[in-house]
């Protein structure tokens, strides 16, 4: 439904779906790394509850996975700064593929970048959008702000 000014009324993210090459391996990853609760599993599909977010996996074993690694495209989740070190340690203990983060200013807060077994990139980040905007407004005069 369109709202009064003709814009689509987006109410939020409905679900996240990831194409996976090995459903069992991916289920184990999402359960262990994200503590996602498995809701249903079929031959080619699994659905999870991730703190109220619907997460879906679809088995697509024949899809080439090499291109996904070249992009900065990722999904970022907010974590509490006090949990950063413990989460980083936990990911290491689970043998998760932790990526080198991009160079950043300390005002940009802390991040852990990592991939699932198929190369989908994720980030656990301690900052907020407001943190980022405040930093950019102060230190990046070349940027144009619309808010």
Swiss-Prot record:
Pfam families: Glyoxalase. Keywords: Antibiotic resistance, Cytoplasm, Magnesium, Metal-binding, Transferase. One of its GO terms (biological process) is response to antibiotic. Its cofactor is Mg(2+). PROSITE patterns: VOC. The keyword Magnesium applies. It is an enzyme of class 2 (transferase). Residues 12-127 form the VOC domain. One of its GO terms (molecular function) is transferase activity, transferring alkyl or aryl (other than methyl) groups. Mg(2+) binds at residues 15, 74, 123. It is found in: Cytoplasm. GO terms for cellular component: cytoplasm. InterPro entries: Fosfomycin_Res_Enzymes, Glyas_Bleomycin-R_OHBP_Dase, Glyas_Fos-R_dOase_dom, Metallothiol_Trafse_FosB, VOC. The active site is at residue 123. Its EC number is 2.5.1.-. The keyword Chloroplast does not apply. Belongs to the fosfomycin resistance protein family. FosB subfamily. Homodimer. PANTHER family: FOSFOMYCIN RESISTANCE PROTEIN FOSX, LYASE, PUTATIVE-RELATED-RELATED. Metallothiol transferase which confers resistance to fosfomycin by catalyzing the addition of a thiol cofactor to fosfomycin. L-cysteine is probably the physiological thiol donor. This is Metallothiol transferase FosB. It comes from Bacillus velezensis (strain DSM 23117 / BGSC 10A6 / LMG 26770 / FZB42) (Bacillus amyloliquefaciens subsp. plantarum).
